[in-house]
Amino acid sequence: MVRIFLCLLKWQFSVLFFFFGVFPMLGQDLEPRAYANVPKGLNVIAAGYVFMNGNVLTDPSLPIKDFTLQSHNMAVNYIKTFGLADKLARIQVGLPFTFMDGSAVISDQLVTGSRTGFADMKVRFGINLLGSPALDKSEFRSFEQKTILGVSLVTSIPTGRYYGDKQVNIGTNRWAFKPEIGVSKRFAHVYAEAYGGVWFYTNNNDYLGKKLEQKPTCSLQAHASYYFKNQMWVGFNTTWFFGGRTIADGVSDESQIDNWRVGGTFSTPIAKGQSVRFQYHIGAYTNNGLNYYALSAVYQYSFF
């Protein structure tokens, strides 16, 4: 009986690590200013750290207690802006590295596990279709943003560490794609933003000797950011993601993701072309799976 419960625990570990690999570039789909208007020819290099800690909601009928997960995540990102058909476009590449630990008490036995390695690389291509022309640095100084409409495609590339014979993995061993549409509206010092996207996944054909499929996951975000004269800004962030039912060798898991998160962001310049950003977010509602909080710190260097 204990062996069965251990298998169930390992399966839940796999699902949780699986979603850790899908959603974050630096955090879980809380990305304010993703469609911000900036000059073309801008290069941005960022290095960040994210700490995540939380508990796992399990079936009450299972003898599982104190199921917790903790991870330390580091990532580097590069962003390049350019003109495309006189519209502002950008490409972003992010590569995370993760240290994860988990533990649970099953039938009065302590079970622990850990993983270390690269997670899946993310590449984002976006273009602002309306309200954001491709301007050089001198032209940009006199431009005033009103309403921006943009689209993007995020691609998750299976570069993460993965073992086909283990339930706990950092990598996902499959590709994922998220087309997204976003709107950004300026109200004096306040920038209001809303994004909507859907994650689509290819199959993982090496999941413990089985084929693992996942239905699309919908993602909605909303952000409100207040800018000060020195380009320091603070923001309120929220996201809702739902769907994502999994199927292993044709057998469906009826549980789906239905999670709502809220958080805040603070960014301030520290020198010419340099800034630091801090973000905190927490689960406001979680129907199943991992209910966690995350704290991140990012250093950013911009140049032309």
Model-derived segments and their meaning:
Residues 52-73, 111, 164-168:
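Surface-exposed strand-loop-strand hairpins of Gram-negative outer-membrane beta-barrel proteins
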